Amino acid sequence: GKFRISGIKSTNPIAVGDKVIFDLDKKGDEETGVIKKIIDRDNFIVRKSVNLSKQIHIIAANIDQVFLLITINNPPTFAAFIDRFLVSTRAYRIDTILVFNKIDTYKLEERAEILYLKDIYEAIGYRCIEVSSTENKNVDTVKELMIGKTSMFVGHSGVGKSTLVNAIEPSLDLKTKEISEQHKQGQHTTTFAEMFDLSFNARIIDTPGIKGFGIVDI
């Protein structure tokens, strides 16, 4: 059936994280869930639809917190992208933690840039964590912050979302890919947002890499 959410014109009226009321439709040995109602959302994250500029795409709903993964290079995450994303999460009342990922790969000048960015964002109240999945640096810190919550991981393609998720919950075994040498950008491994129940009383929403983030109706 078709669903319309009051006040929202989106390409996907049902999103990852939605809570719904449904009926079971049984045909032979197969049962299919038929959604009857979408329960009012506590919050949601949206971005402009790529092909339909007047419409939006709901990335996920009912989120307790977001981990925004940032890399200084391979690929670079620019401050303009970070700021637009933080404006959106603040507007929708979603706590956001900045994860400076691949910390083991940076040279001295790149480390200085991370410290500069951390000073800026910590001064306005955002928690910043330096993480290395390969060296297991602060992976447990991220994991502890996730307990009892639904967390969304987001960032550009290639920032190491899937690698970090695998370090947190190895049984998920999410696919990862190397950075494209030609374009210095990540290659998509996650093609749609997906929620996973984790073994330590937490849920994670893994999202596709985002090239740009357009603010909508704020």
Name what the model sees in each region.
Residues 26-29, 40-43, 72-75, 102-106, ...:
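Conserved nucleotide-binding/hydrolysis micro-motifs of P-loop NTPases
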Residues 1-79:
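N-terminal accessory targeting/assembly segments
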Residues 41, 69, 73, 88, ...:
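Conserved, well-folded catalytic cores of nucleic-acid-processing
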Residues 105-159:
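Canonical P-loop GTPase G-domain recognition
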Residues 78-79, 107-113, 214-217:
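Conserved ATPase-coupling elements of RecA-like P-loop NTPase cores
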Residues 80-95:
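Histidine-anchored nucleotide/phosphate-binding helix
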Residues 1, 11-28, 136-218:
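Conserved G1/Walker A P-loop phosphate-binding module
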Residues 62-70, 93-103, 125-130:
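Conserved beta-strand/loop subsegment of P-loop NTPase cores
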